[in-house]
Amino acid sequence: IIKFICIHNCSISFRLNDNLAEYLNCIFIELAKSIQETTSLSAICGYVTDKLAFSDIETAVYISTENILPDKQGVSSFGSTSASERVVHFREEDVLVSNIRPYFKKMWFATTEGGCNADVLCFRASDKKYSYLLKSILFQDGFFDYVMSGAKGTKMPRGDKNHIMQYQIPCFSDQQLQKFNALASSVEQNQALNRQEMASLETAKHMLLTILSR
């Protein structure tokens, strides 16, 4: 019964987060439709290339392509690697995108810092005010279609980094960006609360099952 209740509540929280993500996506699409001027993706972000030994990253969070779920569903779990491996050091609010077989649409808006391998592209907004906008831009199916249009290789296609940065994005005015960020911030806060609730339920489930099994 305890396990069923925890699973049921977690399922509700997952659906709530999916609905919140879809709501924000609809807002972004509507705002983008009203904007005529475009610019390159490189105008608001760049690739993170800083590398550290994995042992130097306090969170011990490791991400490879296997940890990122298809269809923009975030991560399934955190992986592990050797302490001496050099990894790309990502931070909270960076966007991680699997660069192997981009048609799987694997991406994650980082909720913590950590390290990722070379098969994962790490995008970082050039200014913090662009973080939520960057997330929404890379969330679009059109972005992944564009990446595939310049991908190299047949069996294991990879996106071309230079090509990706030429992706055309809407030029949000300061007022439009401010409005979007206010909504995005509210959505992100609610999603974070739901994630905390899911984690708490999972912890409670394990504690209760341990007690009952004695």
Model feature map: region roles:
Residues Q36, I57, N67-I68, Q73-G74, ...:
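Short capping/connector residues at structural and topological boundaries
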Residues S42-A53, I57-E92:
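Sequence-specific dsDNA recognition surfaces
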Residues I1-F54, I68-D71, D174-R214:
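Non-catalytic DNA-recognition/assembly elements of restriction-modification systems
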Residues V95-F143, S149-K152, R158-N162:
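A short beta-sheet element
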Residues H89-F90, G114-G115, E202:
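A structural signal for short secondary-structure junctions
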Residues T39, R91, N162:
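Structured loop/turn residues at beta-strand edges in well-structured enzyme cores
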